């Protein structure tokens, strides 16, 4: 895991590739989004489109087919900036969200807007009492945190 400041996030860095390492955006700085957009990243909002795709699948089959549907959705050949993906934390789906985006970053440049917190080398989503709660030890993943 590397940690970058928003000022480290240059257009050159974004355009030359991340060597298969996704950027995990934990910063709310407006310039981060502007730099990602100016580097040609396509914003992909997951929740609404994935929900539509899953409606065609019987409820009992969704957990085992959600990752396949997600891969079909993300069949891009340009860098992507992933937002609105909270539904991936649903415990029924059993998706390792960071692993999934690390695999995608081997094919194209990936930046994701983290919907939770980054503290003490850990990314979290929700609070421990929530059923959707997830905690990721960032040292277990090849990622770059922008905070």
Model-derived regions: residue spans:
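Extended, compositionally biased accessory segments flanking or bridging domains
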Residues: 1-73, 122-130, 134, 142-147
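Short loop/turn segments at strand-loop or loop-helix junctions that form parts
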Residues: 45-50, 84-85, 114-116
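Generic beta-sheet signal
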Residues: 20-24, 76-82, 108-112
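Short, charge-rich binding segments
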Residues: 71-75, 102-103
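Conserved P-loop NTPase "ATPase switch" module shared by AAA+ and STAND
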Residues: 75-93
């Amino acid at each position: 895991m590397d940690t970058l400041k928003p000022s480290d996030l240059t257009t050159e860095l974004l355009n030359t590739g991340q060597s298969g390492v996704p950027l995990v955006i934990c910063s709310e700085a407006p310039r981060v989004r502007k730099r990602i957009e100016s580097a040609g990243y396509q914003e992909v909002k997951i929740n609404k489109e994935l929900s539509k795709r899953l409606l065609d699948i019987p409820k009992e089959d969704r957990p085992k087919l959600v990752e396949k549907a997600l891969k079909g959705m993300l069949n891009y050949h340009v860098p992507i900036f992933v937002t609105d993906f909270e539904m991936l934390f649903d415990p029924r789906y059993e998706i390792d969200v960071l692993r999934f985006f690390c695999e995608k970053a081997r094919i194209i440049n990936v930046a994701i807007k983290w919907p939770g917190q980054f503290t003490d080398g850990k990314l979290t989503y929700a609070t421990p009492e929530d059923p959707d709660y997830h905690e990721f030890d960032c040292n277990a993943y090849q990622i770059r945190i922008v905070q």
